[in-house]
Design a protein with these regions (language model features):
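C-terminal helical "tail/cap" subdomain of flavin- and related membrane-associated enzymes
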Residues: 2-10, 106, 127, 405, ...
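N-terminal Rossmann-like FAD-binding beta1-loop-alpha1 element of flavoenzymes
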Residues: 3-39, 44
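Conserved mid-domain beta->alpha element of the FAD-binding
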Residues: 11-24, 205-206, 241, 347, ...
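Active-site catalytic pocket residues across diverse enzymes, especially alpha/beta-hydrolases
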Residues: 25-30, 218, 222, 422-426
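Short, glycine/acidic-enriched loop or turn micro-motifs at the edges of active sites
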Residues: 44, 211, 398
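Intrinsically disordered, low-complexity domain-flanking/linker segments in eukaryotic proteins
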Residues: 47-75, 182-186, 225, 297-328, ...
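Active-site-adjacent segment of FAD-dependent monooxygenases/related oxidoreductases
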Residues: 48-161, 165, 468
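Conserved FAD-binding catalytic core of PHBH/FMO-like flavoproteins
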Residues: 156-365
């Protein structure tokens, strides 16, 4: 019997979940004969390295149609996305299985100690040290601590590997409309792009972030009356300001009290500042604060999150000279003036490595301000198999608070479990036996496996977030007690198993936990 032609898998979103899923399809000996993945992302192509050869490669392109050119590997670098991501063993394991362990260890930064403090934003107030967890992120099973990456750096690693394996990545491809179409090969989805082009795919994968347009389409298929209400994640009474700063841009006269390699969490009267090391002597910082109301969603462009953050706006020259960090604030759902006012209130907050928050801001090259939302969508809201085959991955399927620490790890898990389900239900043997393409069984089991784990993690993230904010005396007491009771013993000396959810080990051949 003739081997069936590979099914086209259209993946909307080329950040983390999308490229990871594509890598599973491209590397597995069975899946690569059954599926042909194509990544689409609305972001522009990565900035080219300024060489004549790279310019020539980019201008020639490698696509098969107008506006469908793929970016050549090894000749480009991804712009800094302005945020970092952390990976624990459950997120690292699938990537290690894909043969990326050496690259991840080279490009990531392994975290060791975590110091907990209490601080105030008034001038002259010193930090109070609560506890230091020695090698607080250590995994005895992996013999490795948590790894932190700049988000764009991890994306570049994955996308470049996709291209090296002959995969396709289409930049500047904003998906604007989806419709089911019939074909001789079965049910398909036509994806229409803003540039006027379109493509038919056998499986549509939404890996396009918390404000996923693929999810919006899927929810409209389920119930147009409730689609918009179900589409927007729930506001959690919290706002977050994130940045990436450079340790090398600090004043030469400054002597840090604590080492660069140490992660810090400073509890405020309400909220907290968390910082941690990243590759290239960069460090991330997250300022998490309570907020009573979120920005009006209709006043901002709530579309799928771009893989590359927008370019910061430039303030007037006089303001920029007085407060150079203003130029690093990227346009978003909040007015720049609102973000700036919050940051000004925290300038005098002390920090063990930078000295104070103002020094941290001054060395920032990108600052992002966003309301913090969370929702775990139902099983039938993350997959559709009626007149077409659609499935969601990562933040498109479940958006969690940053206090989960697992947004990226769970996205990688999603990609791995979905690939495993395709292998289980879409085998060549089933196709030859006259069965349908197997998408229905694969997508339904994927959703059934993922939702309980997502719900548990979201509940934990919400609880940690509430306690971390310390909005009431009760939560302040819980926060203080939890910090003081944090084990100070070096975890490298303990042979404890990884706790949930870090103990998850997902493989394409099977899924677990």
């Amino acid at each position: 019997m003739t081997t069936p032609a590979p099914k086209t898998v259209g993946i909307i979103g080329a950040a983390i979940a999308g490229p990871t899923f594509a890598l599973h399809l491209l590397t597995h000996p069975v899946l690569r004969t059954r599926f042909h993945p194509i990544l689409f992302d609305q972001s522009p192509p990565p900035a080219p390295v300024p060489t004549a050869s790279s310019a020539s490669s980019r201008s020639n392109g490698t696509g098969s149609g107008p506006g469908l050119e793929s970016s050549p590997p090894t000749t480009s670098h991804h712009q800094r996305a302005g945020a970092s991501v952390g990976l624990f063993p459950n997120g690292l394991h699938p990537l290690f299985s894909l043969g990326l362990s050496d690259a991840l260890k080279k490009q990531g930064h392994e975290c060791d100690d975590l110091a907990l403090w209490f601080g105030e934003i008034t001038e002259g107030c010193k930090l109070s040290h609560l506890k230091t967890a020695r090698n607080g992120f250590w995994s005895h099973d992996f013999q490795l601590g948590a790894m932190y990456f700049e988000r764009a750096g991890l994306q570049a690693l994955l996308v470049d590997r996709v291209l090296q394996l002959g995969g396709e990545v289409k930049w500047s491809k904003k998906a604007v409309h989806f419709e089911a179409v019939s074909s001789s090969g079965g049910k398909q989805t036509r994806v229409n792009f803003a540039d006027g082009t379109h493509i038919e795919v056998d499986l549509l994968v939404g890996a396009d972030g918390g404000y996923s347009q693929v999810r919006r389409h899927l929810l409209n298929l389920r119930n147009p009356k409730t689609a918009e209400e179900r589409w927007l994640p729930d506001f959690m009474g919290t706002t977050g300001i994130y940045g990436i700063s450079s340790a090398d841009k600090m004043p030469s006269t400054h002597t840090p009290e604590r080492p660069f390699t140490e992660s810090q969490c400073i509890f405020l009267k309400e909220g907290f500042l968390a910082t941690g090391p990243c590759p290239g002597r960069m460090f991330r910082w997250d300022l998490i604060l309570p907020e009573s109301t979120s920005p009006d969603p209709s006043s901002a462009t709530l579309e799928s999150e771009p893989a590359v953050a927008p370019t910061p706006s430039s303030p007037p020259a006089t303001k920029q000279e007085q407060e150079p960090w203003l130029a690093a604030i990227t346009p978003g759902q909040y007015p720049t003036s609102t973000t700036a006012e919050i940051l000004r209130r925290h300038l005098r907050l002390k920090h063990p490595f930078t000295g104070d928050f103002e020094t941290m801001l001054t060395s920032s090259d990108r600052i992002i301000h966003t309301p913090l939302r969370q929702r775990v969508w139902k099983e039938d809201e993350i997959q559709w198999t009626s007149d077409s085959s659609i499935v969601l991955l990562g933040d498109a399927a479940r958006l969690m608070l940053p206090t989960s620490g697992q947004g990226t790890g769970f996205a990688i898990e999603d990609a791995t479990v979905l690939a495993s389900m395709l292998l289980k239900h879409c085998s060549t043997a089933e196709a030859e036996a006259g069965a349908e393409d197997g998408f229905s069984s694969a997508l339904e089991e994927y959703a059934r496996l993922r939702r309980p784990r997502s719900e548990k993690m979201a509940t934990m993230a919400s609880w940690i977030g509430i306690v971390g904010l310390g909005n009431t005396w009760y939560y302040k007491l819980l926060r203080y007690g939890s910090a003081k009771l944090t084990p100070g013993v070096d975890l490298k000396t303990k042979k404890n198993p990884d706790p949930w959810p870090m103990d998850g080990r997902f493989n394409v051949e099977e899924s677990s936990k």
